[in-house]
C-alpha cells in the first residue's frame, strides 16, 4: 500500500447547538495530536454547525477556540427571542432571528473569504433560488472559479439556515436553506470530491473520519397520531430529514470503505436525550452532556487502532488554482 496516493477526509455533521459535542471532540484530538487537526486531512467537509467548524478549522482557528464559540456564544445564537417570534415562531416566522448568529460569525471571521482559507473545504447548502444542492468549495480544482470570492460568514449562514429554526439566507449567489436538507452527514460528498476532482485518474486510498453531534434518531411513538399537519410536525420534520440522511450515509460509507471509515458519535441515554434532543436547546444540562460525552468520545477514538492512520497522516500542502492563495502557474489553470 506504500505507493498508493492516500487522501483523508474529515466530515462534520450538522446539529445546531449539539455542534458543541463535535467541537469538544475536535479540541481534545487537536490537543493530543499537537498540531492543527486540519493538517491531518486533505479535505474538510462540514454541514450547518459542522460547516462553521469546517470553515474555522480550514482557517486554522484552534479547535478549543471553536469549542468556546459554541459554549460561550450559544445563547446569542439561540438566545432571547422577540415577542412575535415567541408567539409565531414555527408557525409564521422562523423560531430564531439569524442576527445573533451573524454577529458571532462576523466577530470571529470578519472579512475572511473562502479563498483565504489554508486547507481544502467543502460546505453543502441548498440553493432555494435554483432548487438544487450547492457545494461551496475552496479553489482546489481549475473549474472552481467563483466560490473563493465569497465571505466565510455568508457561506456559514447559508449552510446553517435550518428550516423553521432560522430564516433563509440570501447572498450574491441566491437564497439558501440549511445544508442538512441535502447532506447533513457530508462524508459521502467528501468521498465523491476526492474520486472526481482530487484523484480522478488515480487508484487512491480514501479514508473518512466522520464526527457526529449525538443526533437523536427521529422516531414516532406507538400511540402517536398518524394524521399530521405542520402543527404536529414543527421542528420534528427537519429532525427526521437529517436523522434519516445520516443513517443512510453511515451505512453506505461502511459498505464502500470498510475499516477506512471511522465514525465518532454517541447515542444519548434516555435521561440525556431530554437535554440534547432539541438542536436549539442551550442549557447547563445540554452543555455539560455534550462536553462530557465529547471528551469521552475523543479518548475512546484515540485508543482505537482503526483511528491510528488518521493520527499518523500528514496531508500535503493543498494546490489552489484561483484566489489569494493561488499557487500554480497561470498555464496550469
UniProtKB/Swiss-Prot annotation:
The active site is at 48 (nucleophile), 178 (proton acceptor). Induction: Part of a CBASS operon consisting of capV-cdnA-cap2-cap3. A motif (DGA/G) lies at residues 178-180. A motif (GXGXXG) lies at residues 14-19. GO terms for biological process: defense response to virus; lipid catabolic process. A motif (GXSXG) lies at residues 46-50. Its EC number is 3.1.1.32. GO terms for molecular function: hydrolase activity. Keywords: Antiviral defense, Hydrolase, Lipid degradation, Lipid metabolism. Phospholipase activity is specifically activated upon cGAMP binding, which is produced by the cognate cyclic nucleotide synthase encoded in the same operon. Is not activated by cyclic dinucleotides 2',3'-cGAMP, c-diAMP or 3',3'-c-diGMP. The keyword Electron transport does not apply. Disruption phenotype: Deletion of the capV-cdnA-cap2-cap3 operon (plus neighboring gene Q024_03603) results in about 10(4) higher titer of phage PaMx41 in this strain. Residues 10-191 form the PNPLA domain. It is an enzyme of class 3 (hydrolase). PANTHER family: INTRACELLLAR PHOSPHOLIPASE A FAMILY, PATATIN FAMILY PROTEIN. Belongs to the patatin family. Effector phospholipase of a CBASS antiviral system. CBASS (cyclic oligonucleotide-based antiphage signaling system) provides immunity against bacteriophages. The CD-NTase protein (CdnA) synthesizes cyclic nucleotides in response to infection; these serve as specific second messenger signals. The signals activate a diverse range of effectors, leading to bacterial cell death and thus abortive phage infection. A type II-A(GA) CBASS system. This is cGAMP-activated phospholipase. It comes from Pseudomonas aeruginosa (strain BWHPSA011 / Pa011).
Amino acid at each position: 500500500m506504500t505507493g498508493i496516493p492516500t487522501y483523508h477526509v474529515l466530515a462534520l455533521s450538522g446539529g445546531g447547538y449539539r455542534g458543541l459535542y463535535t467541537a469538544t471532540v475536535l479540541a481534545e484530538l487537536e490537543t493530543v495530536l499537537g498540531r492543527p487537526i486540519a493538517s491531518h486531512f486533505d479535505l474538510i467537509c462540514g454541514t450547518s454547525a459542522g460547516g462553521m467548524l469546517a470553515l474555522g478549522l480550514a482557517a486554522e482557528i484552534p479547535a478549543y477556540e471553536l469549542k468556546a464559540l459554541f459554549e460561550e456564544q450559544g445563547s446569542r445564537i439561540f438566545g432571547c427571542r422577540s415577542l412575535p417570534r415567541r408567539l409565531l415562531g414555527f408557525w409564521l416566522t422562523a423560531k430564531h432571528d439569524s442576527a445573533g448568529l451573524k454577529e458571532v460569525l462576523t466577530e470571529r471571521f470578519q472579512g475572511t473569504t473562502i479563498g483565504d482559507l489554508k486547507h481544502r473545504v467543502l460546505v453543502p447548502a441548498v440553493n432555494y433560488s435554483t432548487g438544487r444542492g450547492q457545494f461551496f468549495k475552496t479553489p482546489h480544482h481549475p473549474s472552481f472559479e467563483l466560490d473563493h470570492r465569497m465571505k466565510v460568514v455568508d457561506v456559514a449562514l447559508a449552510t446553517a439556515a435550518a428550516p423553521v429554526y432560522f430564516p433563509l439566507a440570501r447572498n450574491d449567489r441566491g437564497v439558501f436553506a440549511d445544508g442538512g436538507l441535502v447532506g447533513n452527514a457530508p462524508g459521502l460528498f467528501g468521498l465523491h470530491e476526492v474520486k472526481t476532482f482530487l484523484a480522478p485518474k488515480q487508484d487512491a486510498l480514501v479514508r473518512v473520519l466522520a464526527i457526529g453531534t449525538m443526533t437523536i434518531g427521529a422516531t414516532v411513538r406507538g400511540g402517536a397520531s398518524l394524521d399530521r399537519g405542520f402543527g404536529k410536525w414543527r421542528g420534528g420534520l427537519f429532525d427526521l430529514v437529517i436523522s434519516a440522511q445520516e443513517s443512510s450515509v453511515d451505512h453506505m460509507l461502511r459498505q464502500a470503505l470498510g475499516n477506512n471509515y471511522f465514525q465518532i458519535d454517541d447515542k444519548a441515554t434516555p435521561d440525556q436525550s431530554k437535554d440534547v434532543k432539541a438542536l436549539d436547546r442551550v442549557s447547563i444540562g445540554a452543555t455539560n452532556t455534550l462536553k462530557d460525552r465529547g471528551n469521552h468520545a475523543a479518548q475512546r477514538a484515540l485508543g482505537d487502532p482503526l483511528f491510528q492512520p488518521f493520527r499518523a497522516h500528514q496531508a500535503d500542502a493543498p494546490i489552489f488554482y484561483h484566489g489569494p492563495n493561488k499557487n500554480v502557474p497561470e498555464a496550469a489553470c
